[in-house]
Design a protein with these regions (language model features):
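PP2C/PPM-type serine/threonine phosphatase catalytic domain
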Residues: 1-248
Length: 248
């Protein structure tokens, strides 16, 4: 049993007029707000902490990120207990295809929501196991022993072609015209250590400040909102959302 210390923040930034990011912070949806809580893993057989960075015109990105996180929360709550890791992966794959169809269908019905989509990155605790998941270019970092490591791989042209000027063009998401969305998933239960910090973020953080700066903030015990503030002070050209998960 571990104690989880969680902080979450989602900010509009300096340039955008609306916030298309959203965070699901254990028991709270967070958008243009901050939140903090603590809980014991033994008090629940499952929980999810996730972040979605929406995209699309006419505020459709707000709808996509909200719909996906709301759907994920209900899906995880309805999962039967004690699925094996393989069965859990299969259920998550079925969920991804279902929610991708749902988001895409909304775009077909309402032209203002055409091509809307969202990234998704998150940590799930289920059946005494930890999993991380990723679809898009939002990130999961781990800070341990004064070192920051990116656990997820960006699904973007910067990784496909090595062309840095296209780093903001993603190659995978939920909705957004992606007919064959996929999700990286990894079970990392045996690699979770007391003292670890796990940082979920939208690209509004890592586009504004370097990994070295993120590591410096983590070393100081910065909250999610303090990390958002650093990105906003550096320019804040995009929405910025962060979750900091500390394992005790």
């Amino acid at each position: 049993m571990s104690r989880i210390i969680l902080s979450a923040a989602s900010r509009v930034g300096n340039v955008r007029s609306n916030n298309e990011d959203m965070v699901l912070a254990f028991d709270r949806f967070v958008r243009s707000d901050v939140y903090a809580t603590e809980f014991m893993t033994g008090n629940s057989d499952r929980f999810v902490i996730a972040l979605a960075d929406g995209m699309g015109g006419h505020n459709a990105g707000e709808v996509a990120s909200s719909d996906v996180l709301t759907n994920l929360r209900f899906f995880l709550g309805d999962l039967p207990p004690r699925l094996s890791t393989g069965e859990f992966y299969e259920m998550m794959e079925e969920w991804l295809q279902s929610v991708n169809h749902m988001i895409s269908s909304k775009g077909h019905v309402n032209p203002e929501m055409a091509e809307m989509g969202t990234t998704l990155v998150g940590v799930i605790f289920y059946n005494d196991k930890y999993y991380w998941m990723n679809c898009g270019d939002s990130r999961l970092y781990r800070y341990r022993d004064n070192k920051l490591a990116q656990l997820t791989t960006d699904h973007s042209l910067i990784n496909k072609n090595g062309v840095k000027k296209h780093s903001n063009i993603i190659t995978n998401c939920i909705g957004g015209g992606c007919k064959n969305s996929y999700m990286d998933m990894f079970e990392f239960t045996n690699d979770v250590l007391s003292g670890d910090q796990y940082i979920l973020c939208s690209d509004g953080l890592n586009d504004m400040i370097s990994d070295e700066e993120i590591a410096r903030l983590a070393a100081q015990g910065a909250s999610a909102n303090q990390m958002c503030e650093a990105a906003i002070e550096a320019g804040g050209y995009d929405n910025v959302s962060v979750c900091v998960i500390i394992v005790k």
